[in-house]
């Protein structure tokens, strides 16, 4: 019987190594390291002021790190702007979604990169065709791509924002409180969308305070407290009580998590 050497683990889509951010004498994030894998949903959790927004702003190119390194496919990268991060395949869907109310679904998907014919004529037919295709790929049921966004529900708007990231080939999608202010049915649709992103091999970083949502779709939970990463948990091996204890700073819960990690 021939023995084959074990294959090396796949290179993570995104890796943060010792990332820190200082604002004057205030340390917003301190020595945070993490890895995000393709086809995996990672929940980023923490109380207000834990450092979640700072971490997202650095990964999405809004704020440069004070120290540490961001690696994409194992290679160090530096983002001078959000456009740099988007070109590298990192998309962030913020709570405001950045959609234009009076533009159609298709126009919002192609916002800023509209295809043209003859060098100057907007190719609306192509926009509508490709918009319908990407929505079908995501198994999203929406009105026709010519429909203005103002007529869409909250969950449908979230779907348009996510579809835009897929259309532009994003390999990592950061979702900031995607179900905030949504009803039960709309929340279920957004969670289905996250599952579909995972199925298609996209890495998803989910920022949420909703533990039900986290336990429904996440594979891992990264927990920040006072700017530091204090836990990296397998969702299948943890509980709501443990996560809440870590978020609020329970010493006994933190000790248990550290013992298990060791």
Per-segment meaning from a language model:
Residues 2-262:
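Glycine-rich phosphate-binding loops of nucleotide-dependent enzymes
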């Amino acid at each position: 019987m021939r023995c084959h050497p074990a294959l090396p683990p796949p290179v993570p889509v995104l890796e943060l190594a010792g990332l820190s951010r200082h604002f004057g004498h205030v340390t917003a994030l301190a020595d945070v390291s993490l890895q995000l894998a393709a086809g995996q949903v990672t929940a980023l959790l923490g109380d207000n002021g834990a450092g979640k927004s700072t971490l997202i702003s650095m990964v999405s190119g809004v704020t440069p790190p004070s120290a540490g390194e961001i690696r994409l496919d194992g290679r160090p990268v530096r983002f001078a702007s959000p456009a740099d991060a988007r070109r590298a395949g990192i998309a962030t869907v913020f709570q405001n979604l950045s959609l234009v109310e009076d533009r159609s679904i298709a126009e919002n998907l192609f916002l800023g990169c509209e295809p043209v014919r003859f060098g100057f004529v907007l190719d609306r037919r192509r926009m509508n065709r490709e918009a319908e295709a990407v929505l079908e790929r995501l198994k999203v049921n929406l009105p026709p791509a010519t429909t203005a966004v103002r007529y869409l529900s909250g969950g449908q708007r979230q779907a348009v924002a996510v579809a835009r990231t897929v259309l532009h080939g994003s390999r990592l999608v950061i979702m900031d409180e995607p179900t905030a202010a949504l009803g039960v049915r709309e929340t279920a649709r957004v969670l289905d969308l996250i599952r579909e992103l995972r199925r298609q091999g996209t890495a998803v970083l989910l920022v949420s305070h909703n533990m039900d949502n986290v336990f429904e779709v996440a594979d891992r939970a990264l927990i920040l407290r006072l700017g530091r990463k204090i836990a990296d948990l397998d969702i299948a091996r943890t509980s709501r009580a443990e996560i809440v204890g870590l978020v609020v700073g329970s010493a006994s819960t933190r000790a248990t998590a550290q013992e298990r990690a060791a």
